[in-house]
């Protein structure tokens, strides 16, 4: 089993992509932006100009790419454990200040979120500005989650259930732990916005509507995309069911059942492991360079396929006419243009054919 196949999912399943073909689409193509060292995410704050992006590398670096020039904004490789599903996994920015948050696994195998201040040009972190704002002990090396997003004045993040199979510690349903949760930073504390998540690796807010889309990686039966309308995001209401449910199927794990007062919420869309093995949540396209794709949700699978769907229903799915090997993330720049990230190194921009 190749380590890249173990990254995120911990499960290798042979993919029968033909079983998932909906409507073929030749309208979207890819163009290579560049190659990086095990990239896992592309992000960009609204205060950068043009096509500038920041690439998060699993080994511990954040690299800015601006007009063809690369700058290492942050290098914390000596603090990061990057084996298996660990590493520097996510970054995001304050849209109003030169502030960046990063999420990584430290050398003890535990999760950290750290806030850094940037110089005025956003080209490097200010020395000594790092401040830890989240500590979470990880009992296993897999199911680390996680994405960071800044939305409506708050920082959000996700954590997996702590790892192993069948959530042996029943953490996703335990309201007293941060594991298996979607969290929101309220002042100096973290509020649990949603729970019952297995490994919410990649998720996003629709920049126009505020709706939330979560790609939650499954165990043996289902890959799922969970949907929360903007009107419900601010309230801790959603229980996505793990490990009592895997998608819309009752799980075979021994468990204590559902806990807490949240509303059991089934996926907006799911697929089984004859189709793929690790869902990669994406973005609703709101850019200008692919006008026919506006309002469509782009997502994919670690096995390499990419799809788009109607953002509200996740129906009317289109197959993109190319693959990205070891697809680990989608990204969005300040203008809403989309990127696809391969753990093998390439970062691609999605463009009209």
Stretches with model-predicted labels:
Residues 112-149:
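Asp-box/WD-like beta-propeller blade repeats and closely related beta-sheet repeat scaffolds
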Residues 9-19:
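Bacterial N-terminal signal peptides
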Residues 53-74:
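Beta-propeller domains
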Residues 329-353:
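Blade-level signature of beta-propeller repeat domains, shared across WD40, Kelch, NHL, RCC1
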